[in-house]
Design a protein with these regions (language model features):
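Cleavable N-terminal export/targeting peptides
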Residues: 1-22
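Residues that define the transmembrane beta-barrel architecture of outer-membrane proteins
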Residues: 21, 42-48, 81-89, 136-140, ...
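Repeated loop/turn-to-beta-strand initiation elements of outer-membrane beta-barrel proteins
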Residues: 21-23, 60-64, 100-103, 148, ...
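Outer-membrane beta-barrel "beta-signal"
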Residues: 22-24, 28, 148, 176-188
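Membrane-embedded beta-strand positions of outer-membrane beta-barrel proteins
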Residues: 23-25, 66-68, 89-91, 107-111, ...
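Transmembrane beta-strands of outer-membrane beta-barrel pores
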Residues: 27-33, 56, 70-76, 83-85, ...
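Outer-membrane beta-barrel translocator domains and adjoining extracellular loop/strand segments
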Residues: 34-41, 76-83, 118-128, 168-174
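Transmembrane beta-barrel domains of outer membrane proteins
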Residues: 53-55, 92-96, 145-149, 157, ...
């Protein structure tokens, strides 16, 4: 038992020694797709995101990058004053393609768990909180995309996440959130 524990700790330490941390800032575009009584509609909100991840090498060019991020989106058009704030936890599996000295491309895909902190319409008095009434806070998303690393210092990342779970608590209503994002990050 002691040997197995020592082996597990040694393997974990070796993975962490080869891991690379990154922090990113970027733009996001959330699209809320809903279906009520068979009628489909969608609305989009721009925003910003900040995230950090830890890219752990699994084997060769294959890695996994668990992370933690914060996204803020808003809409101030047509009299609406909508804002949403949430935490997201992605687990992206990625495959790296070295292109040239100091430049590589990686494709990634994986699940993301989203937890909504705030979802309000402040154009009404009092403000309407969607999480108190209509929507659930948790959602599961599946995402993918591409990133490029420049000189092992800068990462440019573009991705898309598809909402898999129905966020609505209202019977007969389906609501899913999708997200397009573009970020620039620093590699440690």
């Amino acid at each position: 038992m002691k040997k197995q524990l020592l082996l597990a700790i040694t393997l974990m330490w070796a993975m962490l020694a080869n891991a690379q941390m990154s922090v990113q800032l970027g733009y996001l575009l959330n699209t809320e797709k809903s279906k009520v009584a068979g009628v489909k509609s969608s609305s989009s909100y721009s925003g910003f995101m900040a995230a950090a991840d830890y890219n752990l090498n699994l084997t060769g060019a294959l890695s996994v990058a668990p992370g933690l991020g914060l996204g803020y989106s808003f809409d101030n058009s047509d009299g609406a004053k909508y804002k949403e704030l949430g935490l997201f936890v992605p687990v992206d599996f990625n495959y790296r393609f070295p292109v040239s000295d100091g430049f590589s491309l990686s494709v990634f895909a994986g699940p993301t768990l989203y937890y909504g902190l705030l979802s309000k319409d402040t154009s009404t008095d009092p403000a309407y909180n969607y999480y108190d009434n209509d929507n659930g806070r948790f959602s599961l998303e599946l995402g993918g995309g591409l990133w490029c690393d420049i000189k092992e210092t800068v990462r440019v990342k573009a991705g898309y996440k598809w909402g898999l779970t129905n966020n609505s608590k209202i019977d007969g209503v389906t609501e899913k959130n999708n997200c397009l994002y573009l970020s620039v990050g620093y590699l440690f």
